[in-house]
């Protein structure tokens, strides 16, 4: 990706945030919630998971683009939007891309790219905080399924999540 393409993504991001986030941000902050519709809007603008492969409906760019989108949201003072975006596009989608089955990739990645599905991360625990070495939630294989035992708090994007990556031992 050259600097000109990256600049175009930055400009597109700024315009989308000015139009879709800025007019509502104060209200969202007071309510401690970003509306679900924002995910659909960002997906329609091609801003969600842009570095995922084109076969899933993404732009197939480099991770540099997702970092630039986070930078622009942060520069504009939209830290909560930047954090939720980062979890969705930079953590959950890559987990599915690298560790998911073909069936999971085909099911989830197009929906995450479009904003139809929102990804969340459940890592923080009451006794451990975000220290992954202190995690107590465990996962036990039971036939074809996994049983999770434990508690999570402060789940980023949890309110709207369709898919949650859970940190467990």
Segment roles from a protein language model:
Residues 88-93:
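Well-ordered alpha-helical segments within folded domains of soluble proteins
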């Amino acid at each position: 990706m050259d600097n000109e393409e990256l600049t175009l993504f930055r400009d597109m991001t700024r315009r989308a945030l000015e139009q879709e986030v800025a007019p509502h941000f104060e209200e969202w902050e007071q309510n401690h919630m970003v509306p679900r519709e924002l995910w659909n809007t960002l997906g329609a603008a091609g801003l969600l998971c842009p570095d995922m492969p084109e076969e899933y409906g993404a732009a197939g760019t480099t991770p540099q683009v997702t970092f630039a989108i986070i930078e622009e949201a942060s520069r504009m003072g939209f830290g909560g939007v930047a954090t939720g975006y980062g979890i969705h596009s930079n953590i959950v989608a890559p987990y599915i891309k690298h560790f998911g089955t073909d069936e999971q990739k085909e099911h989830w990645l197009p929906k995450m790219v479009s904003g139809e599905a929102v990804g969340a991360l459940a890592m923080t625990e009451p006794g451990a905080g975000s220290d992954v070495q202190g995690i107590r939630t465990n996962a036990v294989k039971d036939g074809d399924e996994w049983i999770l035992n434990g508690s999570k708090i402060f789940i980023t994007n949890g309110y709207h999540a369709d898919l949650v990556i859970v940190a467990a031992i």
